[in-house]
Structures are given as structure tokens and as C-alpha cells.
Amino acid sequence: MSYESKKVTVAEEGSVVTVTPRSGQIATKDIEVTLGLSPKSLEVYNTKSGTNYKSMPEGSYSFDQKTVVIKKGELVAPTVKVSIDPLTKEMLDSGDKFALPVAITAVSGGQQTLEGADVMIYIMDQVIITSAPVLTGTKPITMEMRQDYTVTQWSLEMRINMSELGDGVTPGVGYPGPPSYQNQAIFSAGPGNGIAEDGEIYIRFGDGPIPGNILQIKTQGTQVNAATKFKNNQWYHLAFVCDGVKLTIYVNGNIDATLDLPRKPLRLVKNSFGICNGDWMVTDAIVSEVRFWTTAISQSQIQNNMFAINPGTDGLEAYWKLNEGSGTEFKDATGHGNKATAPNGVVRWVDGIRSDGK
């Protein structure tokens, strides 16, 4: 049994969905239909889809009517409007995802409903409005992690918006050909001994013959380029997932490139982590939602949690929302105490960043 789902964008003023109960055949008499919520159906949906949606709390939604009638000789009942309030700050801060499992809970006259077709799971897609710092090579973020790491599986996520990405392959602006803006590193961490094969996560735009608008990751002595040609001043969600055998790059939740790995542990020392901390990083980068995992996350996890996630999720080692709006210190939402600071300050803060891109 599976249930249909539908995503609902919930803006600052809330949202309204409509439900129209219908019969599979012309009603031979009046049929009274009652609507409500089915938490059990949401549990089944979560199990089958690998999600962990919480039911919207009581008082955060309302039906304009719960009982409607399919008249004799008709197929459908009057439409029911369900009003949904915006998610509260507490709900947003939790990182949990919410849904409204609307179901036909009763039908008069012993009429039967088609199991699975009597439920609709409305997935709440709350518009998140946040702030984020602008970084560059002279104003990076450096981390002091709580420990060193030796891992066979890991994942890294971030949202990023680059102000300038070259489309040439020359060393710099002063050389013939279009600007390349090579080796613009947006994240790095390493083993501390300078031997890349022992560890290293090095993510950059541009590499010699690789144009500056192409993303590349180096790890364990090998590297792979993304297929996407990135654009200036556009938000992207990036995820890099290592399952111990293969590295996968996701761009906006979609698989972009893969790389076979040498199947050995990755070593990273705690003071080697940094964002936009390379000398070649000369343009501005707005960065948000940086997460480091000690497990390989799934594509559905990536797609369902681009703008927020529960900080207590298993395997989430560090989570910097970078939404403070001011200052040079950034909180690790997991509570693990992984420190992130901008020792030279940030270029500026950008406010009013919306998850719906408006």
C-alpha cells in the first residue's frame, strides 16, 4: 500500500489546500463523508519512503468543514478547504519536517473506501528566510573540530552562491583569453601531513585546463569534475557523499558525477577544516547550511533537507547554519562544539535570502 503525496509551499501568511472527496461510481443515495487526520498513514508513508515527517501539531491547521455529502446521482462532494499556519520558530529551529496526512475517516451507509486512495499526505515546504555571510580568500571561515577523524564513509553539504566564475582556462585575468578565476577553493580539510593520499577533501572551481565555472573535488589522491557549468550569482546546493567505495557529487539534489575510490580510510585532522580559505579565492561567495557527516547520506536525505535538518540526525557531526546575521562566530547546531570563526571578519552579511528563490 502506498499513499499519494503533494508538496505545499507555506509562505509567511500560511497556505490553503483543497480536498474534494469523490466516489468511484455514481452515488445511489446520499453519502456522508468525514475528513480528518490519519497519523498512522503518515507512519506508513515514512516507513515506505525513508522519510521522518512529523504530523502538523493540533491548532496549526483547520478545516472549513469536516463533513460533506456526495448527493445521490453525483460523483463528488463539495470541496473542503484546509488552512495551514506558517511553521513556528520553534518548529523551524527543530529542523524537523512536517506533513498533514488528510484522510477520509468515516463514510455513511457502510460504503467502502479504496485503501490508499483515501489519504493524501501534504508535505509542508515552509519558505525559509535567512541570512548568510559573504566570504572570500582573505576573509575565510576556519574550523576547530572537536577531534581528528578517520572515516570510511563521510558526506559534506553546503549551499553556495559565487559572484564570479571564469569560463576560461588561463591562469588569471592578466593573461590572454577569458578570465579563468582558477583554483577557487570553497572547502578544504586534510590529514595534516601533506600527503593527499592519506586524506584530503579539497573542493574548488577551476583547475588549470578545467574552466573556472566547473566544480572539482580532490580526495585520496584522485579527483573528479562536476558536469554542471555553474553560473554567477546563483544559489546551488552541493553534496559530496563517500560510501567507502564511490564518491558521488550531487548538485541541487541530482547526481552530477561519480568517482571510484581506493577503498581506504580518510584521515582529517581537527584544525584543517576551512571554507573559502585559499589564496586563489578572489571572488565573493555567499555560504549557508554547511554540514559534515561521518556517514554516507542518501539522495532522499539530500533532497528533503536542503534548507534545514534536525541537528540530532544520526551521523551529523557538524552543522553550521551560518544564519547569525552578524558577527564572526558561527554556532555548531549539533551541540558537538565544533568551532567555526571568521578570523578576519566577513565581507558582509546578506539578509532576506529565501528558500523559494524569490
Where are these regions (language model features)?
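Extracellular/lumenal carbohydrate-interaction signature centered on repeated Trp-anchored short motifs
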Residues: 144-156, 227-234, 280-286, 310-313
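Extracellular glycan-interaction surfaces
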Residues: 125-132, 200-262, 348-358
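Short beta-strand and strand-turn-strand segments in soluble, beta-rich domains
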Residues: 43-68, 219-220
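Flexible glycan-contacting loops in extracellular carbohydrate-active proteins
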Residues: 258-286, 311-315
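Extracellular glycan-recognition modules
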Residues: 128-212, 297, 301
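Extracytoplasmic low-complexity segments
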Residues: 118-135, 307-358
